[in-house]
A protein has these predicted regions:
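Extended hydrophobic/aromatic-rich secondary-structure runs
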Residues: 1-70, 312-374
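Contiguous, well-ordered alpha-helical segments that form the cores/surfaces of helical PPI scaffolds
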Residues: 158-165, 185-190
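Short, contiguous acidic/charged loop-to-helix segments that flank catalytic cores in large enzymes
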Residues: 17, 148-149, 178, 201
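Glycine-rich phosphate-binding P-loop
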Residues: 157, 172-181
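Pre-P-loop entry segment of helicase/translocase ATPase cores
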Residues: 7, 14-16, 22-163, 236-254, ...
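Conserved P-loop NTPase motor core of helicases/translocases
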Residues: 111-145, 209-442
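Conserved RecA-like ASCE P-loop NTPase motor core of nucleic-acid helicases/translocases
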Residues: 178, 183-215, 224-228
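Pre-Walker A (Motif I) flank of P-loop NTPase domains
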Residues: 166-172, 196
Length: 443
């Protein structure tokens, strides 16, 4: 290999060199180039070189300068509005927006139509592309790792945070006081920890203020820029905060960071077990109430003592199969098998059920082909008696398993470890960085 302004040639092994050929030219008007997170507005040419799973880029600027970059150095995004289907769908959406009455006056377009008119670029990797051209742009299931929960969580909040990083669009719904703000804070923490930015929007200022105040409470106000109205922007400009000096204390040596990540993973595994047990406990208690209520009504309807002792322990799942089978025979709703093999199979099934009823459940005197009702009542009785005991025993087992965990301590460990890792990421991002002060709202 020879280099410019150097007559000497050099040799390299094949694994040390990437030979890039046959570049693809991209239309600059249909792409956006970001460097260091900032949009490059003076791009005149974009060339893409592919080498295996990697992309290399040559970008030419209006000044004449040409730069070579890898995917990690720049981000080139393409619009989907150059596709016919996308253009037609988006044109339809703009027409629908034009007739929307939101803030629409006789001599003024509606606000929704104004917003649509301002959009001339839709990244083909965004969720919007999946909606306006679903045949080409498929919904993506994303992967995530090492999620942190510095603001605490419960089972549903943990699931919601994970879903936010697995799907392009997530909806978290719940009444006031169910922890939606806490979930949002954990999502924000994970986004910022990954070195990215996040825009938090709402139809009212109080929701945004709530998030901001929670971040201030943990000494994280310096990462927030409250914007929105002109007054809010001007207030932000006049009250800009520098990076606090305590950020220098948030460093975390690599060895300590690895240890904390290991602790975080172990804690999450234990909490997952606790959450699963608590969820099962809640579902079983709900089922217990339903089964007890059904049992009382069943006893009243059939003249059975509610305190009837259980003589034979049998799995309730087996009993309910027998119950439903003979109930359909008693009601005359059992579907007759069609075909020889089906009749043989159904015959063997009926024989197996008769054997179970006669010899395992010992229901000899209840087994009358001409009248199945007594057998059905006996099976129902056995089901309720067995299922009630099964639920009680499982609840006791869950109680004993939960007693081996300290859920409060696990939650505190999760929160503290996550916050330490989050602040360590902020230290790496802001400690040596000069504070940026904006002069006006146009910066």
């Amino acid at each position: 290999i020879c280099f410019k302004n150097n007559p000497k040639s050099y040799t390299y092994s094949a694994d040390k060199v990437v030979w890039l050929t046959n570049p693809q030219w991209l239309v600059p008007e249909l792409c956006k180039v970001y460097r260091g997170g900032r949009l490059q507005t003076d791009v005149t040419e974009i060339w893409q070189f592919e080498a295996g799973q990697n992309n290399y880029w040559r970008i030419k600027y209006r000044s004449g300068y040409e730069g070579e970059y890898t995917d990690g150095q720049i981000n080139v995004v393409k619009t989907c509005l150059d596709e016919e289907t996308s253009m037609n769908t988006y044109a339809y959406l703009k027409q629908v927006a034009a007739i929307n009455p939101l803030r629409k006056e006789e001599d003024k377009e509606g606000i929704l139509s104004q917003i649509y008119e301002k959009v001339d670029f839709i990244d083909d990797k965004t969720a919007a592309a999946c909606y306006i051209n679903p045949d080409k742009h498929k919904v993506r299931i994303l992967s995530h790792k090492d999620l942190i929960y510095p603001f605490g969580c419960n089972a549903s909040q943990k699931k919601a945070v994970a879903a936010a990083f697995e799907h392009q669009v997530s909806v978290v719904q719940g009444p006031p006081g169910t922890g939606k703000t806490q979930t949002i804070l954990n999502v924000i923490a994970n986004i910022v920890r990954n070195g990215e930015t996040v825009l938090v929007v709402s139809n009212n200022n109080s929701a945004i203020t709530n998030v901001q105040e929670k971040l201030e409470k943990y000494g994280l106000a310096f990462i927030v820029a409250p914007l929105g109205s002109k007054e809010n922007k001007e207030l932000f400009i006049s009250q800009q905060t520098l990076v606090p000096t305590e950020v220098s204390l948030w460093s975390c040596p690599m060895q300590d960071g690895m240890r904390m990540k290991s602790t975080l993973h172990d804690t999450l595994r234990s909490l997952d077990k606790v959450y699963a047990l608590l969820n099962e406990d809640a579902m079983l208690r709900q089922e217990q109430q339903s089964v007890d209520l059904e049992w009382r009504h069943f006893c009243m309807d059939n003249g059975i003592d509610e305190h009837t002792p259980l003589e034979r322990r049998v799995q309730s799942s087996l009993i309910i199969r027998l119950w439903l089978h003979y109930q359909s025979k008693a009601d005359g709703t059992l579907i007759a098998p069609d075909g020889l093999w089906s009749r043989i199979t159904e015959g063997l099934k009926s024989l197996w059920m008769r054997i179970i009823c006669r010899y395992r459940l010992r229901l000899h005197n209840k087994f009358e082909q001409s009248d199945m009702k007594p057998l059905v009542i006996e099976l129902q009785t056995l089901y309720y008696l067995n299922r009630r005991i099964e639920i009680e025993e499982r609840l006791e087992t869950i109680r004993q398993e939960l007693s081996t965990y300290d859920a409060d301590l696990l939650t505190k460990t999760l929160t503290d470890t996550s916050m330490t890792l989050f602040k360590a990421s902020l230290h790496g991002r802001y400690d040596k960085r000069e504070s940026i002060l904006f002069k006006d709202t146009k910066d």
